[in-house]
Amino acid sequence: MEKNDYKKIVASCFCSMMLVSSVWAQESDLYAGGTGSKSDPYLIETEAQFDAVRENRGSYFKLMADLDFASYEKEGGWWPLGEWGSGDGSDQRFSGTFDGNGHKISNLMAKHGDDTGAHDMSVFGVVDGGTIRNLLLDNVTVIGGGRLGILTGLTRNATIEQVGVINSSCSNIGTGSNSSGLVGPCAGTTVITDCYTADCNVMAKSTDGETGDAVGGIVSSGNATVMYCYCLLYTSDAADDKA
């Protein structure tokens, strides 16, 4: 091998290493620590870091502090972390693992500007193959249309465990609507365990006064395995009430 060729190879390797390091640095700046792996999850300490979960939807996360969104400003309002997206949308659905670590998220409003008919409005939005655990939501307000829940919208092949929702509301004013105090329409092998909702208002009623399709305290509709969950003091308005 000629000397110049060797130098080119070394330079190429160095540039590749710098590129990888740059990408890692950019991602690490989004969170309080971690690399997003199962053994080293991204650490969340602020509202902005929680918002940045959408940048790595398939990774592992751990909440390290209570979050209060009362003064958190986001142009257009909160948009769910997971989205259906265009095409099959697989890269936009939340498929990671979020461990709330016993902490609380409070005073979040999931309503995207004036788009009251937005689908899958919730905190996490579309969850496909993901896991959410050990989390409390307090005073969360969700307004939209289509598939709604306070924690998640459309939920498929997911695991939801030890999640509580209190003092919150979910108002679906679209047509053909679903609304839930915890999880929106479910599909696949979704399993919900040791969860509860209390003092929540759940409503599904379209703008033309027609009642919505389904509401529920834990899940609005679809197929899911629900174990050791309970719902207290919720109100609803829909044709099919699944409490």
Region annotations inferred by a language model:
Residues 237-243:
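A short, hydrophobic C-terminal helix/tail in secreted or cell-surface proteins
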Residues 12-21:
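Bacterial N-terminal signal peptides
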Residues 24-236:
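Surface-exposed repetitive/solenoidal architectures
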Residues 2-13:
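Bacterial N-terminal signal peptides that target proteins for export
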